[in-house]
């Protein structure tokens, strides 16, 4: 069994925020693979189903970003899911827009959602890092991640969510490197190889 957790803040106020790209990617996976219906449990909205013949629970924590670990750990304990069967989809300031990377373990790069999960569950889960770019000044980060994606960003955002949905079966088959490679090729083919951040010159 696998746990796919999207990170974001609950409710319509935050739905379009850059910080919520993890929710958006997981929503695309749920639609594509018909996971559902959504039910309130584990301090989350949760959907269940199968991907590539494996049982998957998709988790949208309702704890707000900084307490995501409470929800993830509750579901993990209930189902006794090993850490290397957990994939967390989250926004990544240190990657350019439309870049996707996957890694197991490592630091939290200042991401409070990851910090919370690591504190509650341990470190050896997979992070699916979804690049949103950096505003260029640390003082601007808070406003940047809590602002909605610009209209001009929608094409690459949709493509990133499509890539996650298209290749989610590779995650359920424990083939994370192949997931990353296939997503990279897909985004390249869509013309999103070198995306600029909104407002970036170049």
Swiss-Prot record:
Q: What is its main location?
A: cytoplasm
Q: Which GO terms describe its biological process?
A: protein quality control for misfolded or incompletely synthesized proteins; rescue of stalled ribosome
What PROSITE patterns does the entry give? PEPT_TRNA_HYDROL_1, PEPT_TRNA_HYDROL_2
Q: Where is this site: Stabilizes the basic form of H active site to accept a proton?
A: 91
Q: Does the keyword Membrane apply?
A: no
**Site residues by UniProt (Discriminates between blocked and unblocked aminoacyl-tRNA):** 9
Residues of the active site: 19 (proton acceptor)
Q: Which domain of life is it from?
A: Bacteria
What keywords is this UniProt entry annotated with? Cytoplasm, Hydrolase, RNA-binding, tRNA-binding
**Catalytically driven reaction(s):** an N-acyl-L-alpha-aminoacyl-tRNA + H2O = an N-acyl-L-amino acid + a tRNA + H(+)
Q: Which GO terms describe its molecular function?
A: peptidyl-tRNA hydrolase activity; tRNA binding
Q: Which InterPro entries match?
A: Pept_tRNA_hydro (IPR001328), Pept_tRNA_hydro_CS (IPR018171), Pept_tRNA_hydro_sf (IPR036416)
| EC main group | hydrolase
- A Pfam entry, by short name: Pept_tRNA_hydro
Annotated GO CC locations: cytoplasm
The UniProt annotation places tRNA binding at 14, 64, 66, 112
- List the CDD domains: PTH
Q: HAMAP family from the xrefs? A: Pept_tRNA_hydro_bact
Query: How is the quaternary structure described?
Result: Monomer.
Q: Quote the PANTHER family the UniProt record gives.
A: PEPTIDYL-TRNA HYDROLASE
Designated name of the protein: Peptidyl-tRNA hydrolase
Q: What gene name is listed for this protein?
A: pth
């Amino acid at each position: 069994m696998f746990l796919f957790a999207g990170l974001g803040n609950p409710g319509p106020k935050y739905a379009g925020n850059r910080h919520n790209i993890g929710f958006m990617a997981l929503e695309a996976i749920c639609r594509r693979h018909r996971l559902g219906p959504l039910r309130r449990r584990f301090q989350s909205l949760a959907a269940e189903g199968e991907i590539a013949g494996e049982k998957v629970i998709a988790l949208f924590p309702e704890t707000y970003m900084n307490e995501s670990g409470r929800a993830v750990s509750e579901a993990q304990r209930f189902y006794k899911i090993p850490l290397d069967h957990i994939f967390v989809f989250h926004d990544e300031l240190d990657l350019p827009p439309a870049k996707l990377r996957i890694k197991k373990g490592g630091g939290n790069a200042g991401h409070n959602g990851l910090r919370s999960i690591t504190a509650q569950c341990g470190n050896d889960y997979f992070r699916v890092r979804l690049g949103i770019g950096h505003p260029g000044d640390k003082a601007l980060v808070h406003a940047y991640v809590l602002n909605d994606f610009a209209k001009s960003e929608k094409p690459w955002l949709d493509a990133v969510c499509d890539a996650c949905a298209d290749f989610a079966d590779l995650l359920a088959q424990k083939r994370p490197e192949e997931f990353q490679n296939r997503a990279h090729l897909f985004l390249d083919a869509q013309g999103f190889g070198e995306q600029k951040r909104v407002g970036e010159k170049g």
